[in-house]
């Protein structure tokens, strides 16, 4: 199996991607398991930040790297929290604090104006100086609920209602979520690109 460093310390992302990529002969190792610190996310877009993270992990480890930068864009907030989704509630942000801040921010927004979209950009670098990284983007439309529901997933999943499924992302099974989520879409594109190239 080809060892690949996953440029994240987010346990939820590691679990989700490692299980999906193991079928393709890729042994995913979290950067934290290899003593790699987090790259500074100075980009203004998901793509820029994913490339920064992948390049940093590949440079430190000498391994191919996959990085994910993802977040939630809420229409009524002009796309916020966007690239700041993981630290929306401040420096000591947690999933719960971020979720509560978003619900509070949207409390006066009518139900018919609570559309949102999860975005995920996956970047694969063959090596740290790779001039042609594979860049794959997935997006997943939904609606922000007024109350959390479900115990699965992570992040904003309990308040992200998926109209096509009639439930929140946190109420979906891992398999259901992987089949339709932003990360599942980006991963499918990445696997197709790896297969073909």
UniProtKB/Swiss-Prot annotation:
Catalytic activity: XTP + H2O = XMP + diphosphate + H(+); dITP + H2O = dIMP + diphosphate + H(+); ITP + H2O = IMP + diphosphate + H(+)
MF terms in GO: dITP diphosphatase activity; ITP diphosphatase activity; metal ion binding; nucleotide binding; ribonucleoside triphosphate phosphatase activity; XTP diphosphatase activity
Listed cofactors: Mg(2+)
Similarity field: Belongs to the HAM1 NTPase family.
Biological role stated in the UniProt entry: Pyrophosphatase that catalyzes the hydrolysis of nucleoside triphosphates to their monophosphate derivatives, with a high preference for the non-canonical purine nucleotides XTP (xanthosine triphosphate), dITP (deoxyinosine triphosphate) and ITP. Seems to function as a house-cleaning enzyme that removes non-canonical purine nucleotides from the nucleotide pool, thus preventing their incorporation into DNA/RNA and avoiding chromosomal lesions.
Keywords: Hydrolase, Magnesium, Metal-binding, Nucleotide metabolism, Nucleotide-binding
EC numbers for this chain: 3.6.1.66
Entry-linked CDD domains: HAM1
Cofactor note: Binds 1 Mg(2+) ion per subunit.
Protein's organism: Shigella flexneri
Binding site residues for Mg(2+): 40, 69
Domain of life assignment: Bacteria
Gene coding for it: rdgB
Single Gene Ontology BP annotation: nucleotide metabolic process
Database matches in Pfam families: Ham1p_like
Active site (catalytic residues): 69 (proton acceptor)
Protein name (record): dITP/XTP pyrophosphatase
Residues bound to substrate: 8-13, 70, 154-157, 177, 182-183
Subunit structure comment from the entry: Homodimer.
